[in-house]
Amino acid sequence: MDLTLIYTVVGFALAGYSVIANDSIQTLGTFIASKKKWFKWYVLAGSASSVMIIALAWGWYSYDGDISYGRLTRIPYQEIQWYHAVAPAILLLLTRVGIPVSTTFLVLSAFASTVVLEKMLMKSVVGYGLAAMVAYIAWIAVSKFINEKFDEVDDKWIGFWRNSVWISSGWLWWVWLSHDVANIAVYLPRQLDITILLTVMAYFTILLFYIFYIQGGRIQAVVLEKTGTRYARSATIINVIYAAVLFYFKELNDLPMSTTWVFVGLLCGRE
């Protein structure tokens, strides 16, 4: 078998597992925390998988076979070498010990030029600052009216807040995918045929079901440490702010950025 093909398959498989196990929990963590008491893990996994399949299909359709939503426009496809597979392997090790790291820089640094990396760094720094500022302002305002531990939700609003978690989590998950799928798709041709697309969808679905089965793994512990992530109102606010910041930068330009930095900025501002 051609070594390039082996490196491609290994790199893609490791990147897929590492990204889904690491960054996706930063995105879906509040969803798992606030819903696991009410729904079986496979129901939650099925919901997340459905959004993922739709997001990948839409990106593939809208961007002429490119599931990265155009994030890799400035990073041309390269023949995969052994060192390209090292980055996701390191990421996998860090994930196993529960360290949330930036998959974007760890993976794409093996492919991108210095100029592109500098622009990615600047975009991520701005994303961190914006998320921290928005979260800080939002929680100052919200804390004046809501204390999840003591202010119970009025019965007539319970359904609204529980449903809002589903909607906001779905939006956040789609926006996140439009950013971070690039960290996996970088190992694949920029235009995928339908067979490869279906294979990618199947692999991601298996990974998602596994991650939900283990309830997020060690990275989920980082999310659970933050006050309020188990509550529907706080989970919704976290989701909306995170998704809004990511959506803004998605529309800003086609440069990849670190969603982990935005996540950390959000938690920093909130704390």
Where are these regions (language model features)?
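Multi-pass alpha-helical transmembrane bundle typical of ion/small-solute transporters
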Residues: 1-271
